[in-house]
C-alpha cells in the first residue's frame, strides 16, 4: 500500500499541490500530540478551537495544518478549507477508496 503523502491530501481536498511532496506520518487533531511529519486538522469544538494552536503545531514540526479560519490561512504550510471537519471526513473517504479494503 502506498503511504499517505501531502499530494494525496491536497488532491483529495481539491487544493493546490504543495511545492514539495512529503510522506505523512500521522493525521492528528490534538495539538498536544503533534510530532514531526504529522498533518494537523484544526477542529473547532465546544470548549476549544484548535485554530488557536496552529502556529505552535507548525513550530513543532507538523508538515501542514488544515485550517478553516482566515487568520490561520496565511501561515506557512497552512492548507485552507471551508470546513476542517468536513475536510477530514473527505480525506478519510478518499483514503478508504484508495486502500480498497475487503469487508
Where are these regions (language model features)?
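N-terminal leader/targeting and accessory segments in enzymes
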Residues: 1-90, 94
Amino acid at each position: 500500500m502506498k503511504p499517505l503523502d501531502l499530494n494525496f491530501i491536497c488532491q483529495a481536498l481539491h487544493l493546490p499541490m504543495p511545492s514539495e511532496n512529503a510522506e505523512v506520518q500521522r493525521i492528528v487533531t490534538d495539538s498536544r500530540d503533534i510530532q514531526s511529519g504529522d498533518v494537523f486538522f484544526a477542529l473547532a469544538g465546544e470548549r476549544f478551537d484548535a485554530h488557536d494552536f496552529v502556529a505552535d503545531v507548525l513550530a513543532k514540526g507538523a508538515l501542514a495544518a488544515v485550517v478553516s479560519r482566515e487568520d490561520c490561512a496565511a501561515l506557512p504550510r497552512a492548507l485552507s478549507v471551508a470546513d476542517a471537519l468536513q475536510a477530514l471526513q473527505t480525506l478519510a473517504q478518499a483514503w478508504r477508496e484508495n486502500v480498497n479494503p475487503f469487508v
